[in-house]
Amino acid sequence: MAKKSLIQREKKRQKLEQKYHSIRRSSKKEISKVPSLSDKWEIYGKLQSLPRNSAPTRLHRRCFLTGRPRANYRDFGLSGHILREMVHACLLPGATRSSW
């Protein structure tokens, strides 16, 4: 189980990313449209003035049960360890163990 503070920090980053997503996207579109370099520098300054944690690259996918940051499966939102336990307990419909 991950520390609760780390899970809360990740939730805070998600909220910031959602809040500033439209501003960040519109300013990036402006950069491609503006021909002069000085105007581009001004827009870059606006981008840099946004909070650091509002960047989507700062987000990290975590297991929603344990908060584990590694070995996450996107389809289920679970870490590999928990996914395996739930499949063995038949808690995930349609998931089967592979055998060959």
UniProtKB/Swiss-Prot annotation:
<dbReference type="InterPro" id="IPR023036">
    <property type="entry name" value="Ribosomal_uS14_bac/plastid"/>
</dbReference>
<dbReference type="GO" id="GO:0003735">
    <property type="term" value="F:structural constituent of ribosome"/>
</dbReference>
<dbReference type="GO" id="GO:0019843">
    <property type="term" value="F:rRNA binding"/>
</dbReference>
<protein>
    <recommendedName>
        <fullName>Small ribosomal subunit protein uS14c</fullName>
    </recommendedName>
</protein>
<comment type="subunit">
    <text>Part of the 30S ribosomal subunit.</text>
</comment>
<dbReference type="GO" id="GO:0009507">
    <property type="term" value="C:chloroplast"/>
</dbReference>
<comment type="similarity">
    <text>Belongs to the universal ribosomal protein uS14 family.</text>
</comment>
<dbReference type="GO" id="GO:0006412">
    <property type="term" value="P:translation"/>
</dbReference>
<keyword id="KW-0687">Ribonucleoprotein</keyword>
<keyword id="KW-0150">Chloroplast</keyword>
<keyword id="KW-0689">Ribosomal protein</keyword>
<keyword id="KW-0934">Plastid</keyword>
<dbReference type="InterPro" id="IPR018271">
    <property type="entry name" value="Ribosomal_uS14_CS"/>
</dbReference>
<keyword id="KW-0694">RNA-binding</keyword>
<dbReference type="GO" id="GO:0015935">
    <property type="term" value="C:small ribosomal subunit"/>
</dbReference>
<keyword id="KW-0699">rRNA-binding</keyword>
<comment type="function">
    <text>Binds 16S rRNA, required for the assembly of 30S particles.</text>
</comment>
<dbReference type="InterPro" id="IPR001209">
    <property type="entry name" value="Ribosomal_uS14"/>
</dbReference>
<dbReference type="Pfam" id="PF00253">
    <property type="entry name" value="Ribosomal_S14"/>
</dbReference>
<feature type="region of interest" description="Disordered">
    <location>
        <begin position="1"/>
        <end position="31"/>
    </location>
</feature>
